[in-house]
């Protein structure tokens, strides 16, 4: 006697408005993988074209005008104007810190004492947009590039010895592991010597 075997059927539950089990994808109300920028709850996330969550990026180019800083858990924060300018320039420097330093050193020197009391954000934006500036601008542009690249960078405004007195000056310090390295773009551009001790 012939026996008939019923075909086994399995049903897969479609995921909607939720994360995949591995936390790498998010499905919308139609069960499709989300791509692009998506706000989920209180946080913003960025998903690649294949739907995978982008994670752990000091800066991530979403389009020509928008960059994000993305944490290890995928939470994204849109970069400010100056951070975006720094990210664009750093990419043009081949994502290379030494080339970024050389770019800041090569800015055409223009002293501007009227803005000497501004902050690193102002100086950097000035330098990225105008391609010139004084020691404050040279240091600030490099500082912003190092920062968006993920380095523990500090912009320092102080004084250096000049003649029998001292002169206002700015430079950058980067802490790597337990050591602090000094980077002085203006020193290199003015004296033609290596203006850093971090390489």
Give the residues covered by each predicted segment.
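Extracellular adhesion/carbohydrate-binding repeat motifs centered on closely spaced tryptophans
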Residues: 1-87, 91, 163-173, 177, ...
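General structural signal for secondary-structure boundaries
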Residues: 54, 60, 112, 119-123, ...
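Secondary-structure boundary elements
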Residues: 80-127
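Active-site nucleophilic cysteine motif
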Residues: 100, 131-146
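Hydrophobic/aromatic-rich core segments of domains that either
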Residues: 140-199
């Amino acid at each position: 006697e012939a026996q008939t075997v019923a075909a086994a059927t399995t049903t897969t539950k479609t995921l909607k408005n939720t994360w995949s089990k591995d936390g790498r994808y998010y499905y919308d109300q139609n069960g499709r993988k989300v791509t692009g920028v998506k706000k989920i709850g209180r946080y913003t996330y960025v998903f690649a074209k294949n739907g995978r969550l982008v994670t752990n990026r000091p800066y991530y180019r979403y389009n020509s005008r928008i960059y994000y800083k993305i944490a290890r858990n995928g939470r994204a924060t849109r970069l400010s104007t100056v951070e975006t300018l720094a990210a664009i320039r750093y990419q043009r420097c081949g994502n290379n810190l030494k080339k970024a330093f050389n770019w800041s050193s090569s800015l055409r020197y223009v002293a501007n004492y009227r803005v000497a009391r501004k902050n690193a954000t102002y100086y950097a934006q000035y330098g990225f947009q105008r391609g010139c500036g004084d020691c404050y601008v040279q240091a600030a542009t490099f500082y912003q590039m190092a920062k968006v690249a993920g380095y523990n960078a500090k912009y320092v405004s102080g004084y250096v010895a000049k003649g029998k007195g001292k002169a206002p000056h700015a430079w950058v310090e980067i802490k790597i592991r337990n050591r602090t390295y000094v980077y002085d773009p203006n020193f290199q551009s003015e004296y033609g010597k290596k203006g850093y001790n971090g390489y």
